Amino acid sequence: MATNRAKSSTKYIFVTGGVASSLGKGLTAASLGQLLSSRGLRVTMQKLDPYLNVDPGTMNPFEHGEVFVTEDGAETDLDLGHYERFLDRNLSAAGNVTTGKVYSNVIAKERRGEFLGKTVQVIPHITDEIKSAVLAMGQPDKNGQAPDVVISEIGGTVGDIESQPFLEAIRQVRHEAGRENIAFIHVSLVPYLAPSGELKTKPTQHSVAELRSIGIVPDAIVLRADREVPQAMKSKIALMCDVDEDGVVSCPDAPSIYDIPKVLHSQHLDNYIIRRLNLPFRDVDWTTWGNLLESVHNPQGEVTIGIVGKYIDLPDAYLSVAEAIRAGGFGANVRANVKWVASDECETEKGAAEALKDVDGVVIPGGFGNRGIEGKIGAITYARKNKLPLLGICLGLQCIVIEAARTAGLTDASSTEFDANASTPVISTMEEQKAAVSGEADLGGTMRLGAYPARLAEGSLVAEMYGATDVSERHRHRYEVNNAYREQITEGSGLQFSGTSPDGTLVEFVEYPKDVHPYFVATQAHPEYKSRPTRSHPLFQGLVDAALKHQAGRS
């Protein structure tokens, strides 16, 4: 069907949350974005985070989850990973705005005298900075194309002190961009009380009342519950919250996060928003997403991939890695299950054998610090000796190099990250990172971040996986392979340095040849950031394919 595209300004959709955190605002926003994209609209997304950190780059993974890195090198909230995966498009640093970043910019302007001696206040200066960040998302890209829709998610919960400047700012955006160009969606919890056997609407009513008290009237309410919310209850919420009945949608827990677009579409949320904003549209094209759901719900087999890490008590610390593994499964039309393995369990040969006995492949993900390192190395040794498919990421590559060096006779091989005075530092601090590591410069935002090119060796396994010898991946690291040991490691262990930076100075990929090990690959980069559920990353696809062969060989 031809797209009914008329000239119109960019529309802005703001997604807020009420009653409780962790309701799935990000997934709701991403799912709506996916639906609008599937209708032929150009959609971009943004996360407004009310914490005072400038970015999540220095935050504890146990507290915040993973740090998602964009192509342009921004360390951002993990929700940007959901946005990129659901929209299948790259976002930029502008997609994540924090209170810390806003205040830093405003204070810098004050120091430069840009406010001409005026008293700097939350209103208008902080709110103006937030508005500028939001409205900038509607500007044309380098190809001259402005987005049709900008979806901005406001972190936290309505009523939080930290969120107040952001809520005031988006209220003002409605005034400046025009009411016809703005839609507010409120995601709220409808709890089920088991003793009475009832869903309760009162928390949602109070949450919307709080939102209305600061001048924001939601156009739509997404009701989160562990079961379907009946129509009578939706009608009651529409009446009490002064929202159109068509704008109150039920979003019960779904079997998979990839089902959420279908759930919202079945409730006509995308239809309602299109009518509300007078957007050009076409019917939803379910071809790509439908094929994904077929793989999700009707797999032709399954494999188990172990993630050997030290932050496994909070799986969100490895969210993109887990999603990339699952996407590799979708690409092979199998279910890829993730087994969380504490690296400490693999420090001994017996411990590694026990922890990894029922997995078909292993991922050694990134991380920082020396805790759990010997366990990661133990898992690597087990995978190497038992021909278990393995993919190493960032720190995972460094651990593989250390393990190979020890195999080659460099028994004291280590990294300067773990031992500043290591006698055999096969992994060393990057020259430009030494000031940050020594404490002479800031830690935040100073790593080697973002997309960098790499050149792969002709005939290597990684070149076969990518189908190319020139590739680009996103990075987040301070340490690198010490080139002084490369030749000795290869001669003593057989490990091949199969990809480097274009000038050959920085190791980007290592592997064992296929005649030595069926799939033993590592990269200094973070390939998980570029994986999509509808388009798996070559390295993760290779891991799952190798895991299937390993599984078949065992049975």
From Swiss-Prot:
Annotated spans, Amidoligase domain: 1-279
Enzyme class label: ligase
Active site (record annotation): C394, H526, E528
Binding-site list for CTP: S21, D160, I161, E162, K200, T201, K202, P203, T204, Q205, K236
Alphabetical list of InterPro entries matching this protein: Class_I_gatase-like (IPR029062), CTP_synthase (IPR004468), CTP_synthase_N (IPR017456), GATASE (IPR017926), GATase1_CTP_Synthase (IPR033828), P-loop_NTPase (IPR027417)
Listed GO CC annotations: cytosol
Enzyme Commission number(s): 6.3.4.2
Residues involved in ATP binding: S22, L23, G24, K25, G26, L27, D79
Pathway field: Pyrimidine metabolism; CTP biosynthesis via de novo pathway; CTP from UDP: step 2/2
Binding site for UTP: S21, K200, T201, K202, P203, T204, Q205, K236
Pfam families with a match to the protein in the record: CTP_synth_N, GATase
Residue pairs linked by disulfide bridges in the UniProt entry: none
Keywords from the UniProt entry: ATP-binding, Glutamine amidotransferase, Ligase, Magnesium, Metal-binding, Nucleotide-binding, Pyrimidine biosynthesis
Positions contributing to L-glutamine binding: G367, L395, G396, L397, Q398, E417, R478
Biological process per Gene Ontology, one example term: pyrimidine nucleobase biosynthetic process
Domain Glutamine amidotransferase type-1: start-end pairs: 304-553
GO molecular function: ATP binding; CTP synthase activity; glutaminase activity; identical protein binding; metal ion binding
Catalysed conversion reaction: UTP + L-glutamine + ATP + H2O = CTP + L-glutamate + ADP + phosphate + 2 H(+); L-glutamine + H2O = L-glutamate + NH4(+); UTP + NH4(+) + ATP = CTP + ADP + phosphate + 2 H(+)
Binding residues annotated for Mg(2+), in chain numbering: D79, E153
Further remark: CTPSs have evolved a hybrid strategy for distinguishing between UTP and CTP. The overlapping regions of the product feedback inhibitory and substrate sites recognize a common feature in both compounds, the triphosphate moiety. To differentiate isosteric substrate and product pyrimidine rings, an additional pocket far from the expected kinase/ligase catalytic site, specifically recognizes the cytosine and ribose portions of the product inhibitor.
Quaternary assembly: Homotetramer.
Entry similarity comment: Belongs to the CTP synthase family.
Name used for this protein in its record: CTP synthase
Highest classification ranks of the organism: Bacteria, Bacillati, Actinomycetota, Actinomycetes, Mycobacteriales
Name of the encoding gene: pyrG
